[in-house]
Amino acid sequence: SRKGFVYDLKSFSLESSFEYGSEGWGITTMGDYLVMSDGTNKLYHIAPSTFNILREVEVYDNVGPINQLNELEYVGGLIWANVWLTDRIVAIDPKSGAVKYDLDLSGLLSAAERGKLDDKDDVLNGIAWNPVSKTFYLTGKRWPKLFEIKVEIPN
């Protein structure tokens, strides 16, 4: 709908709404601003008070652009994004757009569980960070399970 909403943090009552010019697939906070994906290979650094785009960063790995960036989390100085219609999560340098780590999560669901899903869009689609346990929660569209994983980053 290209429309955003501002809610009161305590009462959750709607305070205002605003329009913006792109699709919003995923969003995360990074310091004093937001980072949003729109299903392309771009990440948009956004001022939260105005929703104006401050900067665009193109995301790429050693093969080329990474399109269909979806849900985002900012953890450990990197932006973690699931790549829609795949079993991948990529960890992105927010300044350069370079993929630093690429997680293959194709083994999360068993063959039997996968067989009950629609191959077209019942895919990995949710990523959330738990700062207490330092783990990610992962799930997908119509998946029967929620997974908690710990990612060990090499020094």
Residue ranges: model-predicted function:
Residues 5-7, 44, 90, 147:
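WD40 beta-propeller blade core
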Residues 1-20:
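Glycine/small-residue-rich loop that forms an oxyanion/phosphate-binding "nest" at active or ligand-binding sites
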Residues 1, 34-40, 81-85, 138-141:
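Conserved beta-strand positions in repeat-built beta-propeller and related beta-rich domains
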Residues 65-98:
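Loop/turn-rich, solvent-exposed surfaces of beta-rich toroidal or solenoidal domains
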Residues 12-18, 55-64, 101-103, 109-117:
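A short beta-strand motif characteristic of beta-propeller blades
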